[in-house]
């Protein structure tokens, strides 16, 4: 009996654990500290800084099953998903890694043993082929002489991409940096499937399938293209779980493995589909994996960046459900079956199941409102199409108005053998982005480009000032040896008390100084293992190697500490008041305010906000000790420590405890006792995305300031109402009731005046071919009264056409009324459109009643004068 996908995953990890590898949990799908990546798309992403020498681990061998997403950006497989055997938006990458430990010999031997040993995967050796880089004789000889693969099944692949080292079998992280040859292992499904071995003209067939890529990082590529040997070569491997599962389960398509068969059956059940071969089932089965895990990792549907990619995938799935005949929201119902089929890899998802389901349901409901209208518009455009390409402007309009991602439009078009002008769509999108950039005023961030080879030691938990040495200087992202007064720069020290922004806590401010210089620090950021002090040299000069005294702004740090500690108390209080589904989705802690985003599906009630405030202030009054302990990550989680969203943790972590009330992993700076916080007040609660709420709060002196401000406002209101704070509510109710009564009386007077005005106007109507035409500009009449006047006049005049206008604050308001017996010849919407166009506006409505607005009041007399001629022509 073949292994299940879950068993294959576990067997891989168990095998490498038996070979001395540390089993490392999958990292988040949101890459940590890597702005070059939209999503985690390979197993090595979480070890990138280790390979670059910027990070160190307490192990030299690791193995993972890494969750990955490829949709959007460079790795955009979305349009192929569901239509081919092996394209996915979400997949798991099995990998083993050596950080300067073993190299080619062991890497190849490990792979061969796992794949062919009867104890493990037991694949037939004669079905396995390998490729090596053309000049990698070492790997070739290991495969031939040590493993024993015949020469005819070892294929050398050269530079097949038009440049030196540009090859399927040569891997590089970028234009410079670690790189090296790789060897790939292929499985031969047999001659009953079309295709040829790698490197042959038929290599794109499905007979020979790549199952494992083993990268040998042995060079450091220089800017001039030369390859310098790395002092400690490393290994990075990747094997797609879905691919190896297909091989081990003896199926040719990833969608036929047990995991997908189960999901496809679940999709059929919730949509009512009966044909299990329908490709829409495969699309939805794939998409629920990426969508659910992205939401669990903190991504929310939106119109930009990662959130937009998520929205595109959700909407593509919903549209395919629509094609299958789904009559109600269905997508969120697949989260439970997904958790079941993922086994141990679904534990993180299970903890957030309710939140993930709610986000998916809300997003589907919102899109369902526009899906039908958008599809109808697309059908209209395709019906008018004379060629075989839909223009980019139309595709953009569908996106902009109805929320149709271009790949969803392309899906519909592909079903009718129509292409989409994606270049035209991108041009329209880029124009929108350009306008957005100009509106935002943001420029380039040179600091984000900085790469620092050195490391800084943070000593700010115990020191607010200390002496350090400058190890690097950067100006506009470029390394320099010295800076002079007036220059803005990033200064890196060997040790520093300055806290670099992390975990939602902002970076410290302060001063770096010496006998002859002063550098004002406005922010502190991390660059790999280095800490950069961002600011401006106020006086003197500063060079690499100089000694400095680093002094943080102590008062500011103290306020930040209070706010950060209060954030932990509030997180725990929210979980007690609202439920344990609450988890952090983002935070900001500075010296003025704390901002906390958390999972919750509805606005907090006033009594819930008060309960959270009361609970936090109760812990402040308890004056609990705030204690820090360093322990292993797994031990911390076993203790119940909550991990913060978006943070990357080492194997050894700081566990912050506040008595028996709160325990979290945190690297930030904190008060000594909860009593130091003084007072906690929530100043706002709002929504930021589907299923995500945001609280802003203040502490200490900031909280006292808000109390005084509230008191001052109440005193001012009491003074204005000639009362005092004790009976203020009664006074306000009395004033509001009196105001409502006066407004009602005023409205009655306006209606009486309008009726009188209507009676006066009726005598001004003229006869045009048997129809009474009344055109008039009114003064002192509110725009909203025009409709009432038109109704009155239609009752008085019988067969009639009426156009009334008024000007208020420079804006023109227009209304046209046409009695029903005349609408076959004159339509109010066309009439009002003709007038509105002349006054710089537009409008519309029914054939018997239409309204419009305009901005050119000076053109109104001429516009009204044109009505008689236009109507006469229509009535002839």
Swiss-Prot record:
PROSITE patterns reported in the protein's UniProt record: AA_TRNA_LIGASE_II_ALA (PS50860)
InterPro entries xref list: aa-tRNA-synth_II/BPL/LPL, Ala-tRNA-lgiase_IIc, Ala-tRNA-ligase_IIc_anticod-bd, Ala-tRNA-synth_IIc_core, Ala-tRNA-synth_IIc_N, Ala-tRNA_ligase, Ala_tRNA_ligase_euk/bac, DHHA1_dom
Cofactor, how bound (note): Binds 1 zinc ion per subunit.
Reactions catalysed: tRNA(Ala) + L-alanine + ATP = L-alanyl-tRNA(Ala) + AMP + diphosphate
Localization per Swiss-Prot or TrEMBL: Cytoplasm
Cellular component annotations (GO), alphabetically ordered: cytosol
Enzyme class: ligase
Keyword field: Acetylation, Aminoacyl-tRNA synthetase, ATP-binding, Cytoplasm, Ligase, Metal-binding, Nucleotide-binding, Protein biosynthesis, RNA-binding, tRNA-binding, Zinc
Residue numbers carrying N6-acetyllysine: 74
Residues engaged in binding Zn(2+): 564, 568, 666, 670
EC number: 6.1.1.7
Known cofactor(s): Zn(2+)
One Gene Ontology term of the molecular function aspect: ATP binding
A Gene Ontology biological process term: negative regulation of DNA-templated transcription
Domain notes: Consists of three domains; the N-terminal catalytic domain, the editing domain and the C-terminal C-Ala domain. The editing domain removes incorrectly charged amino acids, while the C-Ala domain, along with tRNA(Ala), serves as a bridge to cooperatively bring together the editing and aminoacylation centers thus stimulating deacylation of misacylated tRNAs.
Stated role: Catalyzes the attachment of alanine to tRNA(Ala) in a two-step reaction: alanine is first activated by ATP to form Ala-AMP and then transferred to the acceptor end of tRNA(Ala). Also edits incorrectly charged Ser-tRNA(Ala) and Gly-tRNA(Ala) via its editing domain.
Assembly mode: Homotetramer.
Assigned protein family: Belongs to the class-II aminoacyl-tRNA synthetase family.
HAMAP family on file: Ala_tRNA_synth_B
Protein name, as recorded: Alanine--tRNA ligase
Species: Shigella flexneri
């Amino acid at each position: 009996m073949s292994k299940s996908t879950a068993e294959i995953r576990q067997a891989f990890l168990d095998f490498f654990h038996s070979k001395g590898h540390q089993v490392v949990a999958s990292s988040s799908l949101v890459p940590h500290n890597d702005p070059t990546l939209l999503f985690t798309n390979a197993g090595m992403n979480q070890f990138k800084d280790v390979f670059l020498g910027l990070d160190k681990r307490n192990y030299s061998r690791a193995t993972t099953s890494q969750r990955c997403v490829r949709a959007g950006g460079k790795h955009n497989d979305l349009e192929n998903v569901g239509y081919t055997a092996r394209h996915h938006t979400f997949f798991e990458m099995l990998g083993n890694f050596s950080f300067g430990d073993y190299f080619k010999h062991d890497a190849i031997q490990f792979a061969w043993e796992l794949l062919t040993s009867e104890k493990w995967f037991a694949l037939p050796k004669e079905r396995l082929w390998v490729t090596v880089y053309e000049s990698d004789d070492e790997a070739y000889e290991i495969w031939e002489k040590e493993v024993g693969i015949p020469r005819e099944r070892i294929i050398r692949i050269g530079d097949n991409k038009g440049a030196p080292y540009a090859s399927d079998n040569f891997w590089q992280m970028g234009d410079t940096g670690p790189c090296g040859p790789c060897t790939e292992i292929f499985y031969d499904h047999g001659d009953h499937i079309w295709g040829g071995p790698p490197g042959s003209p038929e290599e794109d067939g499905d007979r020979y399938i790549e199952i494992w890529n083993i990268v040998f990082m042995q060079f450091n590529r220089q800017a001039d293209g030369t390859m310098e040997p790395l002092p400690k070569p490393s290994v990075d491997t990747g094997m797609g779980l879905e691919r190896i599962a297909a091989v081990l389960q003896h199926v040719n398509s990833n969608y036929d493995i047990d995991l997908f068969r189960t999901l496809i059956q679940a999709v059929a059940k919730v949509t009512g589909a009966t044909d299990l071969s329908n490709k829409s089932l495969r699309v939805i089965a794939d998409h629920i994996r990426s969508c659910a895990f992205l939401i669990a990792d903190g991504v929310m549907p939106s119109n930009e960046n990662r959130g937009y990619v998520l929205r595109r995938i959700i909407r593509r799935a919903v549209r395919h459900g629509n094609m299958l005949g789904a009559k109600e929201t269905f997508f969120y119902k697949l989260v439970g079956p997904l958790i079941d089929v993922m086994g141990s890899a679904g534990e993180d998802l299970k903890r957030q199941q309710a939140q993930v389901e709610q986000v998916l349901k809300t997003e589907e409901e919102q899109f369902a409102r526009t899906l039908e209208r958008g599809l109808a518009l697309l059908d209209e455009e395709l019906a008018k199409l004379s060629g075989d390409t839909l223009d980019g402007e139309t595709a953009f309009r569908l996106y902009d108005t109805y929320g149709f991602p271009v790949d969803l439009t392309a899906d519909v078009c592909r079903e009718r053998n129509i292409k989409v002008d994606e270049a035209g769509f991108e041009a329209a999108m880029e124009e929108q982005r350009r306008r957005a950039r100009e509106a935002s005023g943001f420029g380039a961030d040179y600091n984000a480009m900085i790469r620092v080879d050195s490391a800084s030691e943070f000593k700010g938990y115990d020191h607010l000032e200390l002496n350090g040495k400058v190890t690097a200087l950067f100006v506009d992202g470029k390394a320099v040896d010295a800076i002079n007064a007036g220059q803005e720069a990033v200064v890196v020290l060997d040790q520093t008390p300055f806290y670099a922004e992390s975990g939602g806590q902002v970076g410290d401010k302060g001063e770096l100084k010496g006998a002859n210089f002063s550098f004002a620090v406005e922010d502190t950021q991390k660059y790999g293992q280095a800490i950069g002090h961002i600011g401006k040299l106020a006086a003197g000069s500063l060079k690499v190697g100089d000694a400095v005294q680093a002094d943080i702004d102590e008062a500011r740090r103290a306020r930040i500490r209070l706010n950060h500690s209060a954030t932990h108390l509030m997180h725990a209080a929210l979980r007690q008041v609202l439920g344990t589904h609450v988890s952090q989705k983002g935070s900001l802690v500075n010296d003025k305010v704390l901002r906390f985003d958390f999972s919750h599906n509805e606005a907090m009630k006033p009594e819930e906000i008060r309960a959270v405030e009361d609970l936090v202030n109760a812990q402040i009054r308890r004056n609990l000790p705030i204690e820090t302990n360093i322990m292993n990550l797994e031990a911390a989680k076993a203790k119940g420590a909550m991990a913060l969203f978006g943070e990357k943790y080492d194997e050894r972590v700081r566990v912050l405890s506040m008595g028996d009330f709160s325990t979290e992993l945190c690297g930030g700076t904190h008060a000594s006792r909860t009593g130091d916080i003084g007072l906690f007040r929530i100043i706002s609660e709002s929504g930021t995305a589907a299923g995500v709420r945001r609280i802003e709060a203040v502490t200490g002196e900031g909280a006292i300031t808000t109390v005084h401000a509230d008191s001052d406002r109440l005193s001012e209101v009491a003074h204005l109402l000639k009362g005092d704070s004790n009976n203020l509510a009664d006074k306000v109710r009395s004033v509001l009731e009196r105001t409502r009564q006066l407004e009602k009386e005023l409205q009655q007077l306006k209606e009486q005046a309008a009726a009188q005005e209507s009676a006066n106007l009726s005598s001004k109507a003229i006869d045009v071919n048997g129809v009474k035409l009344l055109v008039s500009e009114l003064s002192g009449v509110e725009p909203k009264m025009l409709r009432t006047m038109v109704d009155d006049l239609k009752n008085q005049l019988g067969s009639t056409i009426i156009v009334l206008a008024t000007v208020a604050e420079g804006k023109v308001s227009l209304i046209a009324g046409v009695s029903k017996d005349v609408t076959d010849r004159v339509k109010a919407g066309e009439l009002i459109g003709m007038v509105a166009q002349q006054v710089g506006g537009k409008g519309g409505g029914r054939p018997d009643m239409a309204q419009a607005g305009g901005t050119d009041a000076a053109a109104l007399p001429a516009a009204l004068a044109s009505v008689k001629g236009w109507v006469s022509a229509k009535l002839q």
